[in-house]
Amino acid sequence: MVTEVCSMPAASAVKKPFDLRSKMGKWFHHRFPCCKGSGKSNMGTSGDHDDSFMKMLRSKMGKCCHHCFPCCRGSGTSNVGTSGDHDNSFMKTLRSKMGKWCCHCFPCCRGSGKSNVGAWGDYDDSAFMEPRYHVRREDLDKLHRAAWWGKVPRKDLIVMLRDTDMNKRDKQKRTALHLASANGNSEVVQLLLDRRCQLNVLDNKKRTALIKAVQCQEDECVLMLLEHGADQNIPDEYGNTTLHYAVHNEDKLMAKALLLYGADIESKNKCGLTPLLLGVHEQKQQVVKFLIKKKANLNALDRYGRTALILAVCCGSASIVNLLLEQNVDVSSQDLSGQTAREYAVSSHHHVICELLSDYKEKQMLKISSENSNPEQDLKLTSEEESQRLKVSENSQPEKMSQEPEINKDCDREVEEEIKKHGSNPVGLPENLTNGASAGNGDDGLIPQRRSRKPENQQFPDTENEEYHSDEQNDTRKQLSEEQNTGISQDEILTNKQKQIEVAEKKMNSELSLSHKKEEDLLRENSMLQEEIAMLISGDWN
């Protein structure tokens, strides 16, 4: 809510809220703070108020009329309506038609937890009214006049700076630097900066010369002050910094320069608004985009606990709502009154915003469901692969067992053929071998001896040993080749990863170089501006 005491524009600049002034007459002038101090009379043609209208107003407002209008306090009659309270529908129309003046004028609206005038009337916007100074010639001395109008020759300015204090203040606590910066007199600003005047002096509203230069959009003076080390994070009496005023002016280049010199992107004013929240509140879409790119906090809260999304919904800006939803902001966050962005959209009848929020919520639900389903599928796949591996291993074991008797039979046949070649009882062979071979029972003679693996100085042919060694060599070669192949594949994977890392490093270096180039370009532009100023100054000397 706005504060109770605030600066208001002149009464002539305020539109009449649905002929309320003419009907209430002098009571309007006496009872409404926004009309006090105006030079014009608010009386109707009759010179007094309309009694019938006042009776209707009192009956519909009920106890709110009794609390808000001093003319009703202490009267013997009750101002409460027939229902015992005020008419809500009438109060809603009154608030909607009067706008923020309702919040200023009616004490029953001040300090309440609920918003009575929507997103635009909740904050004190008087900080951004009348950015330039109101100057009267008779209130300024020679130096301040020269700084404000800037039409004094350079030699005379130098003489003035010698004779008077350059940091002297006027009645509004303004220095010559304040006046020159606010009015864009860059030559005077440069002279004062060269003589090392005080940079961060505060005027009667606690504003520095840099704040006034930003507020009045004097770019050249802003750059001069920043280069000489002016502090851009000093808040004024409203809590606004230079970046707040740049956002209010929707000056993206100014905001970029301030951030480059170290402005705090998360500083809050007395309403709890960061520069991003202020841009959303005032529907400055281009600056909001810029601040989002500069990684401003999208979850920052104002003094009512409202996020940027809730403020955008309250202002009815569908484009900013869509821009914030693209950044995956939290839709379910609540303010201090316990309301979400969707509830504000429904109560304000913003149908387009309601559709945007519902579509975003559906997409988020689909993402969550897909993320939850993926691990289950992975587990199923791994379990199926393991079962297939077990089946393959089980099938391979019977095959090996079936191959072993076939190998034994082949060996027995070879032994029988050798026995036939060398005769019935060859030299060096024991009798059990010959008996087993002649009887034809390979299982009784040769096979049991092979199973027990006790050779008894047998002299078998060398061909079997050579074949056995050759098989072992082939197996070892296969294993070596497989290990080499796996090593090669691992090396390829490592090289690919190294290449990816190198590409990522190149991208990072290119981005850093681009940012350095941009900074250098800005500095070059500043130096060129300084050279141009120097040329102009030298031309004045000549």
Curated annotation (Swiss-Prot):
ANK repeats lie at residues 138-171, 172-201, 205-234, 238-267, 271-300, 304-333, 337-373. Expressed in prostate and testis. Residues 489-538 form a coiled coil. The keyword Methyltransferase does not apply. Residues 369-494 are annotated as: Disordered. Keywords: ANK repeat, Coiled coil, Repeat. InterPro entries: Ankyrin_repeat_domain, Ankyrin_rpt, Ankyrin_rpt-contain_sf, CC144C-like_CC_dom. The keyword Coiled coil applies. Residues 482-494 have a biased composition (Polar residues). Residues 377-392, 401-412, 466-481 have a biased composition (Basic and acidic residues). SUPFAM superfamilies: Ankyrin repeat. Belongs to the POTE family. This is POTE ankyrin domain family member C. It comes from Homo sapiens.
